[in-house]
């Protein structure tokens, strides 16, 4: 879904400004195509070809699967077939948040000549406001399942060292992208609930366990106070898991 013979895709305005999309949903014609396909009674998978978030609330409950392929290049069709037929186990993770409603994102005016945004966007905005996304930052499905355990964190010099165990509890070999997030105390200044500070890909056979390790430098946790970058003392929250919404949590004093 997403392209015709014209240089611009049908998801763009007839007179696009800088390539901005009119909205975050699929074009009406493509939603109609999904409706027609699901009416056949056969299993339907929707492969989204796009470079940013696409809202799926209107039709997600009617299809069997959704795959975000981004712009996969000339071998994208081959890659898609290999995933769908089980030759390759999917292991990708979303680099953005897919919201349930466009209003959950920062305000956007495609005709504005200038605009000022604050610090809150994506998963940091939704977590700050207590809004559940449709698909969280870092989300991604697999033909395997994974279990996390033994999250540990300690201060080592000018860094926090983090380790977490991840086990393949499924029946197929698969990769998992383990993500590490840090949440600052937020007493001296308002901070995000948590922010990504590292990720690591691990390859696991069925039943195999691996330890993912991260070293998070104190410099990456500083905030700007006037003309200096400060490290706020206090209790830092440490998270590790398969997405920003599915994490184990511990804490460490810095």
Task: For every predicted segment, state its role.
Residues 1-254:
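C-terminal non-catalytic regions of proteins with extracellular/luminal or membrane-system context
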């Amino acid at each position: 879904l997403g392209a015709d013979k014209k240089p611009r895709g049908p998801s763009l305005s007839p007179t696009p400004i800088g390539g901005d999309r009119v909205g975050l949903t699929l074009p009406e014609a493509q939603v109609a195509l999904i409706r027609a396909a699901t009416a056949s009674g056969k299993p339907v998978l929707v492969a989204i070809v796009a470079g940013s978030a696409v809202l799926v609330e209107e039709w997600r409950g009617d299809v069997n699967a959704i795959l975000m392929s981004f712009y996969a290049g000339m071998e994208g069709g081959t890659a898609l077939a290999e995933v769908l037929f089980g030759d390759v186990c999917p292991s990708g993770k979303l680099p953005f948040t897919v919201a349930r409603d466009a209003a959950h994102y920062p305000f956007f005016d495609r005709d504005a000549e200038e605009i000022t945004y604050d610090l809150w966007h994506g998963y940091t905005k939704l977590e700050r406001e207590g809004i559940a996304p449709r698909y969280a930052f870092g989300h991604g499905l697999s033909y395997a399942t994974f279990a996390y355990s033994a999250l540990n964190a300690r201060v080592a010099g000018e860094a926090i060292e983090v380790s977490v165990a991840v086990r393949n509890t499924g029946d197929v070999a698969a990769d998992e992208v383990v993500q590490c997030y840090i949440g600052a105390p937020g007493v001296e200044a308002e901070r995000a609930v948590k922010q990504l500070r590292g990720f690591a890909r691990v390859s696991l056979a069925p039943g195999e366990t691996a330890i993912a390790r991260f070293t998070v430098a104190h410099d990456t946790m500083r905030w700007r106070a006037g003309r200096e970058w400060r490290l706020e003392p206090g209790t830092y929250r440490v998270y590790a898991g398969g997405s920003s919404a599915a994490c184990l949590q511990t804490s460490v004093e810095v």
